[in-house]
């Protein structure tokens, strides 16, 4: 029985046609037809990238149009359809062997070929009922060929490049394939297998192994470094996010919704009303209280390097500001600074923040992102757990004020064992890694396997470890409602956004 196949540009699963990705450089500058000399105006709506052994760069907007049997009888293997920024569609004939590159906006030949294909298909089968394209379009005057072609293009311009495909390896079941596109460049010549860039859910038992293999493939690509200034790669689905808009989307992956790590400065900028942020104790820096000895790098030098790298003085930023007009005291930990580890300065800054909020009767927010106590400061770092907890007790129990703890990924160690879990309301981000001891430490200490996902926010939520799980883009609104519910209102009602 003949099986229907969906052809991606007549060649995705056909290794003998991989050379057609060479179209890339010739079409990079396609604008309104007539401009084939590489215009600076990026006129292609979006990119469809290459998977193959070719050394060429990306193929621009080569759209998948039809899924009919015998498609090769309908259109040449070297003919593609593209769309420019004006929404006009053109057929492109490309022959890499004979160095032929032709662009045509006259669809007469294309329509004729398609009509001939339908007629021949009808004659061969002897029944038009076997060809739904024939039935729908050959005799129904409501449809014009132009509308049909445009409709086909629109149906396949999927921003996620998610297409139902039939695996060329055989089988009767259709599967959803997710084609992970990346920018192909001249440097990408190590990818030898086109199917290695396709993640499929067809075989769930091999998903973990394929994910690890895919992660290795992506991490080995030089392109990740070359285009790091343009794209941010998701840790979960390995998809690419445009860096220019990534922060405005709260560092949430557009492909899968995964929450990537976020700097303390970005959190403050996106959470606190503009012009209201007033930092506290930002000149407080760490010293080497126990003269920690390290064969690799002295503690002071390591602090200096992180200060230069992050632009911060320590692993937490504290201050006061307004959230939708409501005055608050907030501390935001930054995992980029020595893993957000809690040393004496971190503990002192958070303690002073809570004491200030106690005196001013302000609600407190602490955003946790930490690997735990800082080992370079020994017992002094452990003392910060008790010091912060003591200040929090006076704030919450004696003054009856509101403390909201926000757990982000990761929140572990001494932070989890102290102020991270002391909030009147404890909020977690989706998929946040929350634990006291990490998975590796537990497995090495107890010689037991820690199940995957047992330290994720969703699992711990069902165990009652915290209150709600709130997506990052909704957090500001949720906090505003919580504060008003507990009697903290905007200083100016007009400032509510």
Curated annotation (Swiss-Prot):
Cofactor names: Zn(2+)
Cofactor notes: Binds 1 zinc ion per subunit.
Catalytic activity, as annotated: N(6)-carboxybiotinyl-L-lysyl-[protein] + acetyl-CoA = N(6)-biotinyl-L-lysyl-[protein] + malonyl-CoA
Superkingdom assignment: Eukaryota
GO terms classed as biological process: fatty acid biosynthetic process; malonyl-CoA biosynthetic process
Pathway where it operates: Lipid metabolism; malonyl-CoA biosynthesis; malonyl-CoA from acetyl-CoA: step 1/1
Root EC class: transferase
InterPro entries per record: AcCoA_carboxyl_beta, Acetyl_CoA_COase_Trfase_b_su, ClpP/crotonase-like_dom_sf, COA_CT_N
One Pfam family this sequence matches: Carboxyl_trans
Enzyme nomenclature, EC number: 2.1.3.15
Binding-site list for Zn(2+): 234, 237, 253, 256
Residues in C4-type zinc fingers: 234-256
Subcellular localization: Plastid, Chloroplast stroma
PROSITE patterns reported in the protein's UniProt record: COA_CT_NTER (PS50980)
Subunit organization: Acetyl-CoA carboxylase is a heterohexamer composed of biotin carboxyl carrier protein, biotin carboxylase and 2 subunits each of ACCase subunit alpha and ACCase plastid-coded subunit beta (accD).
Family: Belongs to the AccD/PCCB family.
Protein name per Swiss-Prot or TrEMBL: Acetyl-coenzyme A carboxylase carboxyl transferase subunit beta, chloroplastic
Organism: Nandina domestica (Heavenly bamboo)
